[in-house]
Amino acid sequence: MIQLDDYGYPPQPDARGALRKKSIRASKKALSTCLYVCMCVVGALLWLGRRGKKFAPLSPRTVQPRRILVIRLDLIGDLVLSMTVVRALKRTYPGAQIDLLALPSSAQIVRDDPDLSSVITYDPNVWRRPKALAQGRNWRAALSVIRRLRGRRYDIAVSVFGNWAAMLAVASGAKRRVGFGRESYPGFMTDSVAGRHWQPGERLHEVDYCLKLARAAGATVTPEDRIPRLFVAASARDELDMLLHEVGISNDKPLIACHVSSNNGQSKRWPVPYWATLIDHLVGERGAQVVLTGAPGDLPLIERVMSRMEQTAFNLAGKTSLAQLAALLQRADVLVSGDSGPMHIAAAVGTPLIAIHGPTDPAHSGPVSPLATILRSGIWCSPCYNAKGPADCRFYTTQCMKNILPARVLEIIEEKLREKYPRLASSEAQE
């Protein structure tokens, strides 16, 4: 178990730990280099096979696709943002069946979406270590998903992000393959888009990268397409209502959701004592109901927060599915979160939210919603995340998050609650 300091951050590793990290990075680099060389050979063969063929730009005038595959093998928030591609394609090609290929850990959030004909899951992360090559179950899983994809006979495949998505776009047998040229292997894409995500010096949001690909696939993009929208099934709302009734959450008090954890970097988390201070004030002084969200793996961090609290909050971490989490965030009056998947879910279901950013740049990965308020301290080293590894502080201080104090977050929460709960404003006036 990782030891954390009083703020909930890992300490600076010793020399042995740092050396181990370097050796792991070196082995991964060697493996990826070998893979790159092999895939370049495959790409050259693909290019030779279509040499002399001319492809007209994709549009409703030149193609009428029956089946389209969208591939996003990434975290929950990235998948939510990638649904902008699905929306634009479905509007442009209303008669097409659109399938989504996603990670098993993320796919549930969009499984009930009416714009999708099918959601297929696959996790390529099993191949991250060389020993995976000797495990038969990994080969069987890969062959199974490839057979399923090829059986669908896709007309267009959109590789939204990464080399694995590009490889699976080729493996699907799709006639036209759309993706960023510098995120796929040479020769893999028939309709290549120049550049890549996170180009140096380019401050485009993830949604804008997604919409670049949608345009290349022939979609007509409107300004409204920049706002991600997430479908929440009625069954998920009903299941959530039962859960809230069981734990004792009522409808007559403000409901504040707090997501204290974050994937892909511990520096994206707000400090543990700050969470405890904020929640104590919301429950004790404002009479709000606070619900803590998260996965089962987030429980140790949540328990740290709760151990420092004087008031009581509702801990629903590990008790909701992703669909129920979306219903919970839709039901909440406000979400407070760092840069996380639930932050993007809340934005996509139309919930007011406060997004606390430190190492990551909200211009790249912030919530896209008129109801979102972004807080960041803007110290000299922030943002520092470059997408080459987890968002961890190289100075082991995470000062960018420590500078955002609970009083500021509380002030914004109260602003967002005043319209719905007028008595909150009157009680503040009396104070």
Locate each region found by the language model.
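Catalytic machinery of carbohydrate-active enzymes
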Residues: 1-431
